[in-house]
Amino acid sequence: MATPLLTLANTGVNLGDRWLFRHVDVTVSAGDRLCLVGRNGAGKSTLMKLMAGLGEADEGSLWSAPGISVSYLPQAPKLPRGMSLASVVMHGTGGDGDFIAEAHRAEAMLTRFELDPGMLSDGLSGGEARRVALARALVKEPDVLL
């Protein structure tokens, strides 16, 4: 069995008048591919945000392996306007390394997704915006992509 990277245990989110979900357990290990399925409003996006560390549960716990990186790709990505796509994607690198190397990685990732790194982020189609968001999520080579 692979070593867990993320674990949610007995997790629940309360909306005040009702529980969105309760008693949820999820373990993500290296190489796992998981699919969340449920009706609208069941809490799938909320659960993903919890796993990414972007929210707080009302009960339960989240554990992540020390030093792992997590990228979160939201359902409807919001990209900054008026920037080159390379600059948008470089925001995904975290800016903690060599600027030149990060720029090359951003450009390579955009090229992989058939996008022009010099193109401005204004006026992208929905599909193009989605590909830019995916490039931004993948450029830092995360251990977990949500």
What are these model-predicted stretches?
Residues 1-146:
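ABC ATP-binding cassette signature C-motif
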